[in-house]
């Protein structure tokens, strides 16, 4: 298992897509800071460095780019022959998925660090006298979004293993993360309401594209209890990880 993780880390650090994704996410958030600099003067209680660092989560851009990167990363191990060579040597194919998941988690944390540094510097450049704000709130956002982004990585890996076509996988992940597939939720919600009789039933928030923006927005603005905030991300993470694990076991991924 450790050898698999080391190899995947080697691929991560040698891949151009890794650095492109990091710089793209950081660049987008810096651009958002420059465009919303006046916000810090109008609402000083919210216009802080920690608040600006959540912008990239609010827009869903981090989630989108991370999901697309997971497809590129997974496609790479298939196209370079790594899967074909390693599967006969691994007694449990789930280890391949788990090693990928560990590396995706490292990629997420590295990207958060790079984005935080770039955004913090940009905040002090564009806004005079800006305050640091609550790092606890920002830490909670990063922590809860961690599970959502790994859930998206699981989706990306699952689709790539199933389709085995780069462009089709990119299109499928884009549809899921952008919320295009969320059109099924109202119909499913209506059916469940009829079955259960619960008129207050709401499953639209289970759409992963909506969950990402709701988590960061809730932490910073609504101050919801931590347990209430992290339940959905963890459930989605476990759900999609199980689906990905079953897929790699049942599917010929060579």
Question: Language model features by range: what are they?
Answer:
Residues 18-73, 97-174, 178-190, 212-233:
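Secretory targeting signals
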Residues 8, 90-92, 159, 165, ...:
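Generic structural signal for small/hydrophobic residues in well-ordered secondary structure
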Residues 11, 75, 86-88, 156, ...:
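Helix-capping/transition residues at the boundaries of transmembrane alpha-helices
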């Amino acid at each position: 298992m450790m050898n698999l993780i080391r190899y995947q880390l080697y691929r991560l650090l040698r891949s151009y897509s890794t650095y492109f994704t990091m710089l793209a996410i950081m660049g987008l958030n810096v651009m958002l800071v420059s465009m919303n600099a006046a916000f810090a003067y109008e609402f000083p209680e919210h216009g802080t460095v920690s608040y600006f660092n959540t912008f990239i989560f609010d827009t869903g851009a981090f989630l989108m780019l991370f999901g697309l990167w997971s497809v590129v990363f997974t496609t790479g191990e298939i196209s370079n022959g790594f899967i074909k060579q390693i599967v006969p040597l691994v007694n449990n194919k789930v280890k391949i998925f788990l090693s990928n998941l560990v590396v995706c988690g490292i990629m997420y944390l590295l990207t958060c660090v790079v984005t935080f540094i770039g955004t913090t510097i940009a905040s002090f450049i564009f806004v005079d006298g800006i305050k640091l704000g609550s790092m606890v709130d920002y830490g909670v956002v990063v922590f809860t979004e961690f599970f959502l982004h790994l859930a998206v990585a699981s989706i990306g890996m699952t689709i790539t293993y199933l389709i085995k076509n780069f462009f089709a996988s990119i299109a499928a992940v884009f549809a899921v993360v952008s919320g295009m597939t969320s059109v099924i939720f109202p119909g499913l919600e209506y059916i469940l309401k009829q079955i259960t009789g619960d008129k207050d039933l709401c499953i639209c928030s289970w759409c992963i594209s909506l969950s990402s923006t709701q988590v960061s927005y809730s932490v910073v603005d609504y101050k919801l209890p931590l347990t209430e905030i992290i339940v959905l991300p963890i459930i989605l993470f476990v759900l999609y990880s199980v689906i990905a694990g079953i897929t790699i076991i049942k599917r010929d991924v060579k």
